[in-house]
Every structure is written in structure tokens, then in C-alpha cells.
Design a protein with these regions (language model features):
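Extreme N-terminal basic, low-complexity initiation segments
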Residues: 1-13
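A cross-taxon signal for low-complexity, glycine/charged-rich
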Residues: 16-17, 33
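Phosphate/dinucleotide-binding and metal-coordinating scaffold of catalytic cores
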Residues: 35-323
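Leucine-biased recognition of intrinsically disordered, low-complexity hydrophobic segments
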Residues: 14-16, 23
């Protein structure tokens, strides 16, 4: 993660041992504790600052794994970001979901790369030969979304590592709350970086905002965890217990503060609403209703998979050595 700290963003170092109030025990035990936590994370009321804003200075390379064609971009704060563009297929709603869900996950003690808004002049990509990239940049002038680039991070492999049950239960409960369908075995959207696991790519969550007219019907929609990458590591009781601990943290103050992080202009001209304030209120109402009745949407995950036994000490010893 880049070393510069944008103005107005104070951090408290978290020493090992979990002395940070309100941090789940697993967040300390898992990977040696969080590297940095916003200084106001433990306060009962939430006064979140506006997301930091940077200006893109260099288009580095497109990321072709995703259909929306995000890119690695350098910015004027000397940081490097994965930028998602408002001119991509899902438009600004995917960026809104990234902010609300990503920052909600952070407030639940999960690791999420820093999120910023990125001012973009399409001219920075003028030397990019791909016409699809040119079209996307030209469709995305102005404010876009940046997610801190984690250099050297690796994709999470559930076959190589058994996650802490508390961590797995928290992630699944969070994904169920926001309706995140993009945490599957095929595409975990989890990165391992410096020994910690980080959550990324929440643009497919909050799918209710694609059909506001029927959003109320989706409040109690059960979450399908059959393909969730962490479902086999926990049982129903673990997810329920995670909810008992997490739901009280999601107060009206916090939900409003999360939604207030979204740039106002991204909520303009929404069909069925008179103003961006009405759109923001609708997000809070939907999330509040979801938090209030988790029994309606919590998935059944069945019994946890037993932990893998340790490999025999000489498991990799060639047989011919024993002849």
C-alpha cells in the first residue's frame, strides 16, 4: 500500500494482542492483526470524512480479467490504484456498491483496500492501442472509483489454506447482508497480501438498486451460499453467532455515514426519485430493514468441513530413497 496518507485520514497502529476496542478477536489472531485501522473506528457515533480524492496522472495497464475493464492507474498522491470507471457496463451503481459495501466490511473489522475517488482526464490513455480502452476512457471523464493496488498480492486458494472459522463466518454474514454474489470458488475476490486476507470487488452487491420499484420485496430474500468460497468452513451456528455480534454495530448513524460517502452526483437523475437525498435515504432504509431481520435471509450452510490433517512428515519423500 502506498506510504502517503491523504490529508484528514488519521491512522492508529494496532499492536499485536488486540488492544483495539471493538476489534473482533479473530481479526487479531488472523494473520497477526490489522496493519492499520482508522482512528475513529471504535467511537460509538460515526463521522466519516469524505472519501479522499486524487487525480489520475498515468494510465498503466488495463486489467482484462474482469468484464468491466478496470485499470491500474497512478495518481498525484504517488499512489497506485485499481480504477473502476463509471462508463463501464453497470455504470455508477457498481461504484456505489463498491463504496457502501466495501466501507461496511471495513467497519465490521474486515480488511478492504483503501477506497478513493479518482478524477480522470481521458487524455491520459491516449497511447493505449486497444479501442475498447479508448472508448471506456472517453465514456468516463470526471470522477471514478479507485481501490488501493496491493502489489505482489496473490489470489486466495481455499484448497491450500483453512481459514479461521470466525473470519469465514464474518465474511459470509457480510456477503449475505449486502447480497454479494461474487465470492465463489471460481472467483473468490479475496487477496492474500503480507499474510493477511483482503476483500475486493463488491460492485455486484446491493443488487436491489438495479430495480428500486421492487426493492422492498428483496429485503427478506434469502442469500444463496451454495457456491460461496467459505461456506464449507463454517456451520449454521457460526454464521448466526457472527450476526449476533455484528448486527448491533450497524446503527442508523453508521448506515447513513456509509451512504454519505458516495459522491452526490452519482445519485443524480435516478428514475423514481426527486433528489439524491431521496436516493441516499432509500439505501439506508433498505439496509436497515435487512439488518433488522437476518433470520429471513441468512443462508443454511450445513456442517463445517473438518480441518485437514497435517501432511505426514515425509509425504514428499521419493519412494526410491527407501529402497
Amino acid at each position: 500500500m502506498h506510504q502517503t496518507v491523504p490529508p484528514g485520514r488519521a491512522y492508529d497502529a494496532l499492536a499485536l494482542g488486540g488492544r483495539f476496542r471493538g476489534l473482533p478477536a479473530w481479526a487479531v489472531a488472523f494473520g497477526g492483526g490489522m496493519r492499520a485501522v482508522r482512528s475513529h473506528a471504535a467511537t460509538p457515533r460515526y463521522r466519516m470524512p469524505v472519501l479522499p480524492n486524487v487525480t489520475a496522472t498515468r494510465y498503466v495497464t488495463p486489467l482484462r480479467e474482469g468484464g468491466s475493464l478496470p485499470a491500474i492507474v497512478e495518481a498525484d498522491d504517488l499512489g497506485t490504484y485499481v480504477v473502476k470507471f463509471h462508463g463501464a457496463g453497470q455504470g455508477r451503481k457498481a461504484l456505489i456498491a463498491e463504496i457502501i459495501s466495501g466501507e461496511l466490511a471495513r467497519r465490521l473489522g474486515l480488511r478492504v483496500p483503501d477506497i478513493v475517488t479518482v478524477d480522470l482526464d481521458p487524455v491520459i490513455g491516449r497511447h493505449e492501442p486497444d479501442p475498447d480502452v479508448q472508448d471506456l476512457l472517453n465514456a468516463s471523464p470526471g470522477r471514478n472509483l479507485g481501490i488501493d493496488y496491493l502489489p505482489g498480492s496473490l489470489g486466495f486458494d481455499p484448497l491450500a489454506w483453512t481459514p479461521d472459522p470466525g473470519f469465514a463466518a464474518t465474511v459470509l454474514w457480510f456477503d449475505a447482508l449486502v447480497g454479494n454474489v461474487d465470492r465463489s470458488w471460481r472467483n473468490p475476490n479475496l487477496l492474500v497480501w503480507h499474510g493477511d486476507v483482503w476483500l475486493i470487488d463488491h460492485g455486484a452487491s446491493l443488487y436491489f438498486h438495479h430495480a428500486w420499484a421492487s426493492a422492498a420485496k428483496l429485503v427478506a430474500k434469502p442469500y444463496d451460499a451454495s457456491d460461496h468460497v467459505l461456506a464449507t468452513f463454517i456451520d449454521d451456528e457460526a454464521v448466526t453467532q457472527a450476526g449476533r455480534e455484528l448486527a448491533p454495530q450497524l446503527t442508523d448513524d453508521l448506515l447513513r455515514a456509509l451512504v454519505d460517502l458516495v459522491p452526490v452526483d452519482w445519485m443524480e437523475d435516478e428514475p423514481g426519485f426527486d433528489s439524491p437525498a431521496d436516493v441516499a435515504a432509500a439505501y439506508v432504509t433498505q439496509l436497515r430493514a435487512r439488518v433488522a431481520d437476518p433470520a429471513a435471509w441468512l443462508p443454511e450452510v450445513g456442517p463445517a468441513r473438518p480441518a485437514r490433517p497435517p501432511a505426514p512428515r515425509n509425504a514428499s519423500r521419493p519412494r526410491w530413497l527407501d529402497r
